[in-house]
C-alpha cells in the first residue's frame, strides 16, 4: 500500500463516517509532509502530518509542541496519533502565513501587533527554557 493510501486509511478509521478530501498543506525541512483535510459536512479542517517512521520519529515533535504549549505559544492541538505509522491529526491553524498577514494593509497597526505577538511568544519560550529540556 502506498504511503498516501495508508494515511487515507488511517484518517478514515480515526474519523469513521466522515467523508474528507486531502490536499497538500505545506512542507518543512524534514521528511514530514502535511495535508489539509476538509470535510463534506463542513466540519473544521484539520492538518494531517505524515512522518515516515523509518526516516522521522514524531515523538520529539510532540515533545517540543507540548513544551511550547506549556510556555504559552500557540501550537496545533494533537487530536489523534499513530506513532507506529508516523501519523498525527492536528488542529488547523490556518493557511495565512506571517508574510501574507504583514502585507495586509487594512490596519496600519497590523504589523506592529503581529511582531509584538511573535516577540512575546519567543520571549515566553525563552523564559520557559530549561537546560536539557527546552
Locate each region found by the language model.
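Juxta-kinase regulatory segment immediately upstream of eukaryotic protein kinase catalytic domains
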Residues: 1-20
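Short, flexible, glycine/charge-rich loop motifs used to bind or transfer phosphoryl groups or to couple energy/partner
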Residues: 11, 24, 78
